[in-house]
Amino acid sequence: LNTFQLLKASLMEPKKQAAVRILAIGKIMRFVFLIILLLTIAAFVEFTIGLNSVSGDLDGLLLYIEEIEWLLYPLAFILLFVSTTLYHFIKISLFAWIGMAILKAMKRRGEYRHLWRTAALGVTVPTLLSFIIGFFAKNEWLPLLVSLVTLVYLYMAIKYYPKMPPQRK
């Protein structure tokens, strides 16, 4: 699967989300970093637009920012990328851990590494939706809604994991 096929699978194909458990981790990492890069670029553009639209009350600060602009923007972009990457990897890992509990409750076969790959695709749509909604409205319930949607995506994908073999007596 290429990156665009992974994006399509993350949008609407829970069966393929479950099937990515057997893909190489490198393909999943490339997909995750691409999503993080796109989110970082969009957030950085929002940051620079917001920085340029600061009111005239801060003339001294604006002058200082204009003087160090060549240093501020690259460092801000790198810091934003690193912090976004850390946040998303922690989020994917936590959802994979929760997915392990769902997996055991549904009596399905799988390992944490499989669920990490599935969770990496499962968080894509809710993350993109929350990012888009965040541009238009600020809502304190949005993180909870994103988490619930991610769990639904994860649950739908786990349904396609193989069942545990029956216990031998």
Say what each PLM segment does:
Residues 1-39, 169:
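N-terminal juxtamembrane cytosolic/stromal segments of multi-pass membrane proteins
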Residues 33-44, 128-129, 141-145:
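Alpha-helix boundary/capping detector
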Residues 42, 46-47, 78-98, 148:
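Hydrophobic alpha-helical segments embedded in or immediately adjacent to the lipid bilayer
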